[in-house]
């Protein structure tokens, strides 16, 4: 393959699409930094989150007191969101009807306007769904950065699952994929996790 000779551009013609759900808006902010990709994300503007779901970090899950405080906060956020959406919808509906718009049409428009502003109180833990398409070269870069032990836990777990899906499909492309320490020295220097041997045992070389 040309990629064996140091030419990576040919693998840009191979693309992979992933359906991703049950991840937080925190992860969304990180994954969209990878610019050579296409994203379709569940809208909080047009979809009212009556069924408020959220991601609980493992470190919070592991400490009962922290978990209780986190769950209470999520319940409060959910109620504030729904209360605010309701107040905004009622206010917008009254204004639009006062301007002569029929009630059914006014309420439909008011609902969208309410969702647009009510979402500002939603936490980063709020779940979202997305479809992501990346070419193979971008995926190699993504795996190098996000499979690293120093990557944030949620996006690292996602990267590992994505790698597990694409490797069986195209092992000739992804045989050297993974964190940078798979194919060379760790680039983190003093910040190295010190678990290179463990990483190498988990990632196919």
Regions found by a protein language model. Give the residues of each.
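Family-specific signature for flavin-dependent thymidylate synthase
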Residues: 1-202
């Amino acid at each position: 393959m040309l990629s064996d000779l140091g030419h990576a551009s040919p693998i840009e013609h191979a693309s992979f699409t992933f359906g991703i759900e049950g991840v937080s808006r925190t992860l969304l902010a990180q994954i969209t930094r990878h610019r050579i990709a296409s994203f379709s994300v569940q809208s909080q503007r047009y979809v009212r989150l009556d069924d408020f779901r959220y991601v609980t970090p493992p470190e919070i899950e592991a400490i009962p007191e922290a978990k209780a405080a986190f769950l209470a906060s999520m319940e409060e956020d959910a109620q504030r969101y729904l209360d605010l959406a309701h107040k905004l919808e009622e206010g917008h509906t009254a204004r639009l009807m006062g301007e002569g718009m029929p009630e059914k049409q006014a309420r439909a428009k008011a609902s969208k306007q309410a969702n647009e502003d009510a979402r500002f109180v939603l936490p980063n833990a709020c779940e979202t769904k997305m479809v992501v398409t990346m070419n193979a070269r971008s995926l190699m870069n993504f795996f190098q950065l996000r499979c690293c032990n120093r990557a944030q836990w949620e996006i690292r777990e996602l990267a590992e699952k994505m790698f597990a899906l694409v490797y069986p499909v195209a092992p000739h492309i992804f045989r050297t994929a993974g964190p940078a320490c798979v194919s060379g020295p760790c680039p983190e220097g003093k910040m190295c996790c010190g678990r290179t041997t463990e990483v190498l045992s988990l990632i196919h070389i």
